[in-house]
């Protein structure tokens, strides 16, 4: 069996570089000029002065300029419109001869200005990039005309961000701890369970030591999760994309393969003798794994296999980005991380009490967790491999697991039937995955569906690909939105990335459904591809203040976003159809 496992693991380095069509370790979407994010190119601030007037100020970075004719003040009484100062003449490929502002722009609204105001502006860079139109809602207080597209309804992420602003810290921490408990059972959080269980069981730690190890893992995971969330929100960067770079995922997949080797008895993973003796002296007889090692593994889990983009996470990030209150937002994210880790901690520590006392069976358990480590590496490799290649690798892993289970069953007096049945199931499933991979399957749960689809003459995902127009540049998005507005069309913006597992699931289980495609007839479907971590992707994300994919945004026939109807995170077909019907009815 060791030979089979070794051969399987030797495939991983080559497969991790097998992404078709490009160099795996080449930076994606690299450009010759890296432009400033729009919020840094045009820094906007406003304040109400002592005399009641409202001062609006744009600080414009060198090499950038704002268009005079692109300034908008929606919701402001025409009699209160500000007097625009003269600009400098400028001619470019985007708007021809125009008046533009450089360095700074200050405007003053009279004291009578009140209510909801939506500002709009647009600028470009001398180096050749034209940013998409920007907008910001201002609450000037008092009463006044409502800005277009506003209502009392808010999206889930907005509601959570609002609760953070309105509520006290203790309530916010409790709320997000509870949300974390729910997120612990999301599919993208489940890979953390075998990592933590393998750590505790593989160390042979007792109940108390196991609790300390699990606590160290969960605590460090929550700390890293909170820290990265705060950094991402304050810097406005696409941190998800950075953490999903091929070299990083490939490195950590190799690390989990390396961690699996000791579980199969290839070697014993331990510190150098001198350092080990010193630590043994300091620990004074404590048995079990290293707390520092558990903390390091927890940090890696927070980086790579933590929860995906969901409404609670988006709400916390939106709150930090809007208020700049990194301390409050960081504590909330830390509480969310603790909530995610709590069920894992209970399953590993409390569940371990029902296991028999240490003995020869531990070698069997270590082998099980070795396969779980290999499965984690397989999951990490998904964004790097084509779907068929990834499914084929999973099928090979299942066949090796089936052989191991059947081989183990022959040497057991008890539970032989259980292991034999498991081996047969794994073997059949692995064979099905290999057969499906040979035909180009893209769903590991239904690997043979590709043959049924071929008999019908089409694949389910082909219709989904054809229905959506992929957009990766802000200028193309502007053209599509303008065309939809001219035709009075609804628009669905689907933020997507190749490394986003939830995006792929929704592509197959939502947008490939005939009833979903039928319901979306007449809607302009745009897939905003933010796979690459470059200026264009950052602009697409910042356009609607989206923290990351998957996110679904509805644009009405008049060109305004229905912000309260935004969907963040994974949704099933039934939920999506109900949501779209309600959105269409409300207009």
From Swiss-Prot:
Transmembrane domains' residue ranges: 173-193, 217-237, 247-267, 300-320, 331-351, 361-381, 384-404, 417-437
General function of this protein: Required to facilitate the formation of correct disulfide bonds in some periplasmic proteins and for the assembly of the periplasmic c-type cytochromes. Acts by transferring electrons from cytoplasmic thioredoxin to the periplasm. This transfer involves a cascade of disulfide bond formation and reduction steps.
Enzyme class: oxidoreductase
Taxonomic classification: Bacteria, Pseudomonadati, Pseudomonadota, Gammaproteobacteria, Pseudomonadales
CDD domains: DsbDgamma
Protein name: Thiol:disulfide interchange protein DsbD 2
NCBIfam families: PRK00293.1
Keywords, sorted A to Z: Cell inner membrane, Cell membrane, Cytochrome c-type biogenesis, Disulfide bond, Electron transport, Membrane, NAD, Oxidoreductase, Redox-active center, Signal, Transmembrane, Transmembrane helix, Transport
Signal sequence range: 1-18
Gene transcribed to yield this protein: dsbD2
Domain annotation Thioredoxin: ranges: 448-585
Gene Ontology MF: a single term: protein-disulfide reductase [NAD(P)H] activity
Protein's membrane topology: Multi-pass membrane protein
């Amino acid at each position: 069996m060791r030979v089979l496992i070794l051969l399987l693991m030797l495939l991983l380095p080559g497969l991790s570089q097998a992404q078709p069509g490009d160099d795996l370790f080449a930076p994606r979407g690299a450009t010759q000029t890296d432009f400033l994010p729009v919020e840094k190119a045009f820094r906007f601030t406003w304040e109400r002065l002592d005399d009641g007037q409202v001062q609006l100020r744009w600080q414009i970075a060198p090499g950038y300029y704002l268009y005079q004719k692109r300034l908008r003040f929606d919701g402001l009484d025409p009699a209160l419109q500000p007097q625009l100062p003269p600009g400098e003449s400028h001619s470019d490929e985007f708007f021809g001869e125009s008046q533009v502002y450089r360095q700074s722009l200050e405007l003053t609204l009279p004291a009578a200005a009140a209510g909801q105001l939506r500002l709009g502006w647009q600028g470009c860079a001398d180096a050749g990039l034209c940013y998409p139109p920007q907008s910001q809602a201002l609450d000037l207080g008092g009463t006044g005309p409502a800005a277009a597209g506003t209502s009392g309804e808010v999206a889930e992420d907005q509601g959570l961000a609002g609760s953070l602003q309105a509520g006290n810290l203790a309530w916010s921490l409790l709320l997000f701890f509870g949300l974390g408990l729910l997120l612990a059972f999301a599919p993208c959080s489940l890979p953390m369970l075998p990592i933590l269980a393998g750590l505790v069981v593989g160390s042979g730690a007792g109940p108390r030591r196991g609790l300390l190890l699990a606590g160290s893992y969960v605590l460090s995971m929550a700390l890293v999760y909170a820290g990265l969330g705060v950094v991402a929100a304050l810097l406005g960067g696409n941190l998800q994309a950075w953490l999903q770079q091929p070299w990083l995922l490939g490195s950590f997949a190799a690390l989990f393969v390396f961690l699996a080797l000791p579980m199969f008895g290839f070697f014993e993973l331990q510190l150098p003798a001198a350092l080990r003796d010193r630590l043994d002296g300091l620990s004074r007889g404590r048995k079990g794994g290293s707390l520092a090692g558990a903390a390091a593994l927890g940090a890696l889990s927070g980086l790579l296999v933590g929860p995906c983009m969901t409404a609670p996470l988006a709400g916390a990030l939106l709150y930090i980005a809007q208020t700049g209150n990194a301390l409050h937002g960081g504590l909330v994210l830390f509480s969310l991380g603790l909530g995610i880790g709590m069920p894992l901690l209970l399953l590993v520590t409390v569940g371990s009490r029902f296991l028999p006392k240490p003995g020869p069976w531990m070698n069997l358990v270590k082998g099980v967790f070795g396969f779980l480590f290999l499965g984690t590496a397989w999951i990490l490799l998904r964004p790097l491999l084509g779907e068929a290649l990834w499914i084929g690798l999973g099928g090979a892993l299942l066949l090796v697991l089936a052989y191991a289970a059947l081989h183990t069953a022959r040497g057991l007096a008890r539970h032989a039937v259980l292991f034999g049945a498991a081996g047969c199931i794994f073997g059949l499933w692995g064979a099905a995955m290999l057969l499906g991979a040979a035909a180009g399957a893209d769903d590991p749960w239904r690997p043979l569906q590709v043959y049924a689809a071929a008999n019908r003459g089409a694949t389910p995902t082909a219709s989904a690909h054809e229905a959506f127009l992929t957009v990766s540049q802000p200028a193309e998005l502007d053209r599509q939105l303008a065309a939809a507005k001219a035709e009075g069309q609804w628009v669905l913006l689907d933020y997507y990335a190749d490394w986003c597992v939830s995006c792929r699931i929704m592509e197959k289980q939502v947008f490939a459904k005939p009833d979903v495609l039928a319901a979306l007839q007449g809607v302009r479907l745009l897939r905003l591809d933010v796979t690459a971590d470059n200026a264009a992707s950052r602009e697409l994300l910042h356009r609607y203040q989206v923290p990351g994919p998957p996110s679904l945004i509805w644009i009405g026939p008049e060109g305004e976003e229905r912000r309260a109807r935004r969907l963040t995170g994974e949704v099933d077909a039934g939920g999506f159809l109900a949501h779209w019907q309600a959105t269409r009815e409300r207009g």
